[in-house]
Every structure is written in C-alpha cells, then in structure tokens.
Amino acid sequence: MTVKICDCEGECCKDSCHCGSTCLPSCSGGEKCKCDHSTGSPQCKSCGEKCKCETTCTCEKSKCNCEKC
C-alpha cells in the first residue's frame, strides 16, 4: 500500500484528510481514508494554539497566526 501526502483539499475523502497529512489510500466505495498527521509539521505550541499540519506558523504577542499551505 502506497502512502501519499494529501493535498490541502480534494484528495482522499475530503472530510478525513488534513493538509499535509499522510494518507493511506483505503478509500473505496465510500470508506473513510485513514490519515496520520505528519510528524514534521510545525505546531504553534508556545502560543497555546494548535495549527493544522504543514501550516506556516508565526507567533506574535502570544497569538498564533497560521497560514494554510
């Protein structure tokens, strides 16, 4: 089974995959895809706010600004 990286939208059961997540393509006949978050994705933990995987995150004045990929 090939592991692929999901696009931000549109790949691998839209409602199941997040931008940059690794996707195990088990999506057949309405099944949900099994997606795992990328371990190397930047998280804005120091700001106390979580960003979606593979977003660019900048912290200013304890606020987390996340940009979609």
From Swiss-Prot:
Pfam families named in the record: Metallothi_Euk2
Keyword Metal-binding: yes
Keyword 4Fe-4S carried by entry: no
GO biological process, one term: response to metal ion
GO molecular function, one term: copper ion binding
Keywords: Copper, Metal-binding, Metal-thiolate cluster
Membrane-spanning segments: none
Function in brief: Critical role in copper (specific) homeostasis and detoxification. May protect by directly chelating and sequestering copper ions.
Family label: Belongs to the metallothionein superfamily. Type 13 family.
The protein, known as: Metallothionein-like protein CRS5
Gene name in the database record: CRS5
